[in-house]
Amino acid sequence: MDVVHLEIDDPRWPDAVRRLRHDFYHLPEYVSLDGEWNRAQPMAFLARSGDAELFIPYLLRRCESLGPAEVGDAEVYDVVSPYGYPGLLLSDAARRSPRFAREAMHRLSETLRAMGACSAFFRMHPLLSDGFAELFSPGFFTAAGETVAMDLTLDEGALWKGVREGHQWTIKKCRKLGFVSRMVPLREHVECVMEIYRDTMDRVQAKESYYFGREYFARLAGMPGHVHCALVESEGRPAAACIFFECGGIVQAHLGGTRSEFLSKSPFHLLLYSVAEWARARGNRYLHLGGGVGGASDRLLQFKRGFSPLLFPFSTLRLVTDERKYRELTTRRAQAADVPVEAVSCGGFFPAYRAPL
């Protein structure tokens, strides 16, 4: 088995992605953008043995924000998925070989440890990881809720029938009130989308990590082949907006929201259904709406379930690649917060040393 950790400009990265069924989150240009935003090094792991391949992108982060970035004489890192649903990719041959899949993941852990990483946290892709759990021992993945997708292979009538009655009423009401939904170039509407998104994050009191700067939106706007923008207007005034990714038959809702003054009219209902119609007309298979905040079964998930009964299990992968360093950082976190180590290590957050306390 050949294994390698790829840097962002390595031509083997796009070559590997082209050979595997993938999504926008696996492309080097997206991982690079997310790495810059998070001040982390964008990388990917590739394992190959004949036709069997395993690929996963990741961000390599220094642990300096947790205190001194060294444990002993060595600098300490950890690994996390880019924002969204990157997850493992497996070739067809790899999906038929539990032995290959397990050995590849063992080599991933070994090589990350050699690079100084003490842990890794990966978010799986709900639509691309079917059957993965059977390849590994029980408990290898951690269940993290469900996500919602609209099946765009349905005919127009069946697609509409899958929408909850209350959502149907809201969509028809928006149209009757004169709201118009259209796809627009993100490059020409960056300021508008940013304003609506920030208004939405302020309203829901989102964590700081959900706020993205202008450069982030502008960089997305420079990827028009995969990145699209939907806008709902009322008499020419922007009411709701959302950025979508399109790749390999999957359309992903990324960042969006509703302007507060239009909230009572719920124009985002119209936006999502209109995008489903647009994506279906372009021959895509799924519009993936995602799940609740942090995978929770919350109001956001219930809202999304109103557009489709189709649910996919969402899971994460948690690896401790260096037990000693992991324990040391966890102890430091507990000491800094003046709480018992057990309050950090048993709290369910991973990695424990980054738990919000």
State what each model feature region is.
Residues 62-64, 127, 136-157, 284-357:
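Active-site/acyl-donor-binding loops of N-acyltransferases
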Residues 61-87:
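Conserved acyl-donor/pantetheine-binding loop and adjacent beta-alpha core of acyl/acetyltransferases
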Residues 99-144:
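Non-catalytic accessory segments adjacent to catalytic cores
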Residues 2-69, 125-264:
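A conserved beta-strand-loop-helix scaffold within acyl/acetyltransferase catalytic domains
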Residues 86-96, 153-154, 256-265, 293:
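A short, internal acetyl-CoA/4′-phosphopantetheine-binding micro-motif in the GNAT/acyltransferase core
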Residues 40-42, 114-117, 284:
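Short, high-confidence coil segments that cap the C-terminus of an alpha-helix
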Residues 121, 182, 286-290:
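Short catalytic-loop micro-motif centered on adjacent basic/acidic residues
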Residues 46, 216-329:
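Aromatic (often tryptophan-rich) hydrophobic motifs at membrane interfaces
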